[in-house]
Amino acid sequence: MAGAAAESGRELWTFAGSRDPSAPRLAYGYGPGSLRELRAREFSRLAGTVYLDHAGATLFSQSQLESFTSDLMENTYGNPHSQNISSKLTHDTVEQVRYRILAHFHTTAEDYTVIFTAGSTAALKLVAEAFPWVSQGPESSGSRFCYLTDSHTSVVGMRNVTMAINVISTPVRPEDLWSAEERSASASNPDCQLPHLFCYPAQSNFSGVRYPLSWIEEVKSGRLHPVSTPGKWFVLLDAASYVSTSPLDLSAHQADFVPISFYKIFGFPTGLGALLVHNRAAPLLRKTYFGGGTASAYLAGEDFYIPRQSVAQRFEDGTISFLDVIALKHGFDTLERLTGGMENIKQHTFTLAQYTYVALSSLQYPNGAPVVRIYSDSEFSSPEVQGPIINFNVLDDKGNIIGYSQVDKMASLYNIHLRTGCFCNTGACQRHLGISNEMVRKHFQAGHVCGDNMDLIDGQPTGSVRISFGYMSTLDDVQAFLRFIIDTRLHSSGDWPVPQAHADTGETGAPSADSQADVIPAVMGRRSLSPQEDALTGSRVWNNSSTVNAVPVAPPVCDVARTQPTPSEKAAGVLEGALGPHVVTNLYLYPIKSCAAFEVTRWPVGNQGLLYDRSWMVVNHNGVCLSQKQEPRLCLIQPFIDLRQRIMVIKAKGMEPIEVPLEENSERTQIRQSRVCADRVSTYDCGEKISSWLSTFFGRPCHLIKQSSNSQRNAKKKHGKDQLPGTMATLSLVNEAQYLLINTSSILELHRQLNTSDENGKEELFSLKDLSLRFRANIIINGKRAFEEEKWDEISIGSLRFQVLGPCHRCQMICIDQQTGQRNQHVFQKLSESRETKVNFGMYLMHASLDLSSPCFLSVGSQVLPVLKENVEGHDLPASEKHQDVTS
C-alpha cells in the first residue's frame, strides 16, 4: 500500500476496495445503530485503548456484569449439594445453564453432557486421565494418542499421561493430514475396537487457520487415518479458540470430546470451562479419584464406592463454581442481545481480519521491501478457512526481522494491546518460523524460555506478533493499528495514507445515505492521548525541575564522626568545574521506585547500592507495585532524604510536604510479602498518613511500602555473567542490578539524532538534561565515545570496583518526560532505529567487592577507570593501561 501510495498520492483506499469483488459480501457491525455507540456504552473503559488480544481473552461488557451482579443482589444461591430452598434454586439454575450451553452449540442433552471444569486445560487433562487407553504389550498393540502439531501446549501435554501407561503418542503435521484427506481410503479392519484418540483444534490459536470440521466424521469412520493403525478412533475437537467468534454446530459435527473456556467467548467469568462429552463416549471414561458430590455411596473404612449415575455429577469433584456458572447465563443473554448471535460475530470479526490482512500485506518500504511477514495457511478468503487472527513479524527495509519484544514495547506507546511469543503453540511456531528442534534446544541453552522477552537469538526470531479481533472490535481499532505500523516503520506522520474505511451495518462498500455507518477517516496525525495522558494535562502537571536541575546539589549532612573521606574520593583528585575524561559528572538515587530522582554530589554506598536507592515503592490497593508504565505521574513525586534527621521528605505540587522515617519501628512493624520482578521481598507499610497523601494525589487508593531491613534479595545470574568469586550481590527494589551507568557521549549521540530535522522540516527538540533524566541512571560519566561503555567488563571509581553486568534493555518508560509526565514515543523509536537490534542504553553494574567496615562514598568528580572485555583476564595490568589500548 505504501509503495503504491508514493505513485498515487493521496488517493484513499476504501474498505470495499480492499476486498476481492468476486468474494461473498460480509457484514460489519450488528444491524441498526453505530458500533461506536455500542463501544462507548458497553466498553467505555476502552477509551484511548486499542485492544487486539481477543484470542488471549476477550472483554466483558458493562451490561453483562450489571445483569449478573443484579441477579446476585436479588437472589440467594446456596451450595447445590444441600437440600434447602436456596440450594435447590442453585441446582435448578445450574441445570438450566447446562441446557443453554448445549443450545448454544446446536445440540441437546440427548446427545451431549456438559461437565464443568476449571477451563479447557482442565477438560483436556480430564480426557487424558479418563480415556480408556490400552497399554502396548510385548506382543500386542496398544492405543494411539495422535495430535496435530498445530496444537496448544495443553493438548501436547496429554502425551505425558499416555507415556506413563505405555501408550504411543504420535504428532501429526497439518500438511500430512491434508494430503491424507486427498487420498482418503475406506475403513480397514472394522472389527478392531482398540480405542485411539485424535486431537486437533477447530482453529489454530497461532495463525487462525480453521481446520475442516469434516475431519471429525472422516476420522471416526476410518476414511481418514492420522496413523495407519486399526482400531476405533475417537476425536477430541479443541474448540476453545474457535468458539470465541464462531458458531459450532455439534449436531452436524459430532466430536466425542469438546473442551471450551467461557472467558474466551464473553470475557467473564474466568477460571471456568467445560468438557462437552458425547453420550456415546461417556460410558467409556474411567475415573480413579472421587471427590465430594460424585458418590452415590461409599465406605470410609472399606474399599466400597458407587459413583453417581449422571456423567456430569460423576466427574465434577467437589462443589462446582456455581456462581460463575450462573454468570454464564448473563453472558449468553448479553451476547445475543448486543450482536444477534455467533454467526454475526463470525462475519464481523472476519471482515476486520480480512481488511487488516490485505492492508498489512500491501505495506512496503520505498525500496519495495515488505514491512511485515505474515504467517498464514490461508489467503483470508473466507471465514470457513480463517479466523480473526493475524500472526506476523515486522521487518526492516533490508528484510531483517524486528524482535517481537521491541514491537510490543512500541505498541504500548500507542496504547495498543497485542500478544507476542509463541502463544503456547510451539509446533505452529516452529513450522511457520522455520525453527528446528535443535534450535529450540539451543535457544533454551541460551536462556530463552516460553513467555520471556528474548525475541532474537543469532538473528533468528524465537516468536512473533499476534493480533486478534473480538465482537466489540471496530475499524477504528484497525486504523489505529495500521497507523502504528506506518508511523514506526515508514518514518512519516503524513506522507503515507492509511486506508479509509467505509462500513455499513450490512454489506461492504460505501455507506448508504440512511445508514448509521462508522466512517474511519484517514488521519495520520498524532494519536489521541490515552486516559493517563489526559489526566496529566490537568492541574497537577508542572515542571519539577527544582528537584533535578539544581546543580550542584548540596551534599547531604552526615555525622562527621562516622563519615571521613575515603580513598575513593581522594583518588579522584578532580576539582569541580575541571572535569576531565571518564569522571563521574552526576549521581542520582531514586528513593521511591519509579518516582523522581534525588540528585546528590556525594553519597554513601551500602551493600545494595547507593544508600536508600529504590528502598520504597508505591503499590495499589491490591499490593501491586506501580510503575510509570501504568502511572506516569509517579515521576512528579519528589523525595528528598535528610540523613541527619533520618527522614525522607516527599513533595508534589498542590500537596503539603510529608515526612517518612528512614527506618521502621521494629515494635510496630508488620512484615508483608510483596513482589518485584518475580522476586518475593519482605516489606512493611509506611502508614495511613502517607497512604492518604498518595491516594489524594493519584485519585485512587495507594500505599507506600519499604523493603524490610531483614529482607535478603539476591541478584540473579543475568546477562550471561557469573558473579565474581567471593561476592554475593544483594538488591533493593531495583529491577535488575545495583547500579545503572550511562555515558554523556551516548546521550549526545541520541540527542543529535532526535534533533535532526524530519521530512517535513519540523524539529522536535529535547534538552540534554531531559534525555539524561529519562534513562534514570545512578551514575553519569563523561566518556569520550558514544556507547564505548558497552565494551567494558569492569570499572573502578576511585578505589571501588564494579563488575559490568551488561546492557539495560529499555522499555517504553524512556518516552516519559521526567519533569512533566508527558509521553513522547519518538525517543524509543529513534533509539530503536539507531541500535538496530535491541533497544539498549546504559550498563548495569554491581559491586565486584565491597568492604563496609569503614564508610564508602561515591562522589561527583571521581575518576572512572574501565577494564575492557578482551583484557578482563589481565587483572594485573593497571586499568588505565588497559583503557589506553583502544582510546589512545
UniProtKB/Swiss-Prot annotation:
The keyword Ribonucleoprotein is assigned to this record: no
EC number annotated for this UniProt entry: 2.8.1.9
Protein's name according to its UniProt entry: Molybdenum cofactor sulfurase
Cellular component GO terms held in the UniProt record: cytosol
A Pfam family of this chain: MOSC_N
Cofactor field: pyridoxal 5'-phosphate
Modified residue annotations for Phosphoserine: S34, S528, S530
